[in-house]
Amino acid sequence: MPFYENRSVRTYYEETGSGFPLLVLPGGGLSGTLASLATPFNPMERLKDDFRCIAADRRNAPSGQSTGPLESGRPWDSFADDHLGLMDHLGIQRFGVIGFCISGPMILNLIKNAPERVVAAAMMQPSGYRPELPDLFYQNNMKEWGPALCEARADVTMEMVDAFLTSMYTDRTGFVFSVDRDFVRSCPAPLLIAPDDVPSHPYKMAMEVADLAPDSEVTIYPWKDTPEHIDEVVEHARRFLKAHVPVNA
């Protein structure tokens, strides 16, 4: 089982396929692991014929194998560190990204941290702020992720979880938590957005990102309602990501 280690962070990852590198970020919120990629579709299976697909368990997902400190002062950047560090470990300089749910905000922050490295990104059912449920992510994670992490890790307390979630969500309300609207207006990477509309995946916020970004595409909506629609979105993602592979790759 492959692990990448960087100081106190240990990341479990897998890769499959061949071609231009594609970083695959699971949904499942802070509990996201490789197993979370099973639905609505698994890029590790569906895109492996066109890309070298690389995915990892999220740091501190209770059921996963990736561990590290809770960096409450820089929650989103700590995940970007993990993603970029893994690419460095594998000797990959430039890559595409596809991700689900919480990975939408993570992708935008990844582009902010390494604009020269991300050639294109597909944000599937991205999460974002919903004004009628302003504390949704804090409350859900205090109820589920936090206690499960504390049970798995004797060095983590609910006070630490509270500080992390407050910094990650409560102090960053109003948009997508990880970046502001000005960044999206100048986002250097092409974006593909597949909107959803459940409490944690607000349609309005996904479409605002698409409207603000200077180079964006939007898939059909709804798309998770039938296998045929899922297939259509998978093919859209494949075309989009392939279209932005550098010619000298």
Regions found by a protein language model. Give the residues of each.
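Conserved HGGG/HGGXW glycine-rich cap/lid loop of the alpha/beta-hydrolase fold
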Residues: R7-S66
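Active-site loop/oxyanion-hole signature of alpha/beta-hydrolase fold enzymes
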Residues: N42-E45, A55-F95
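Short beta-to-alpha linker loops that shape the active-site pocket of alpha/beta-hydrolase fold enzymes
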Residues: D57-A61, S127, P222-K224
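Conserved hydrolase catalytic core segment
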Residues: Q93-Y129
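Hydrophobic, aromatic-rich cap/lid helix
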Residues: A154-D180, C187
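Short beta-strand/loop motif that positions the catalytic acidic residue
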Residues: C187, I193-P195
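Conserved alpha/beta-hydrolase "acid-adjacent" motif
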Residues: P199-M205
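Catalytic active-site module of serine/aspartate enzymes centered on a nucleophile-bearing elbow/loop
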Residues: S216-A249
